[in-house]
């Protein structure tokens, strides 16, 4: 009986998909170099990054949707993030970047030395 229970637990653990981690931020963030406090108006042609649970969408770029694979804290407000994506040309691609929380309304995504300054949307 004990062997059956252990076997059932092992099979269940192996059959359960790995759960992706959530991003360290959530909501809609617009591209902005402004230092103004508070959320900004994100209407118009502004680039929008939307973090929702373990998914991220980007209104500008070749890959519209990403799924988070891992989040590693590398400091008090810095994170190393790995996302997965699929599009017409790439299957199971990965995107690696760092995310820095400046304050509750400002973050910076840095991928391959290119910084994208974002501010929370209203």
Where are these predicted regions, by residue range?
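Short, hydrophobic/aromatic-rich segments at coil-to-beta transitions
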Residues: 26-28, 52-56, 75-82, 104-107
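Beta-sheet ligand-binding and adhesion/scaffold domains
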Residues: 35, 78-122
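Hydrophobic/aromatic beta-strand elements that line small-molecule binding cavities or substrate pockets
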Residues: 46-49, 67-72, 94-101
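Sec/Tat signal peptide C-region and signal peptidase I cleavage site
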Residues: 16-20
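Short, solvent-exposed loop/hinge segments that bridge or flank secondary-structure elements
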Residues: 23-59, 90-94
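Hydrophobic helical h-region of N-terminal Sec-dependent signal peptides
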Residues: 5-15
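A short, amphipathic edge element
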Residues: 60-68
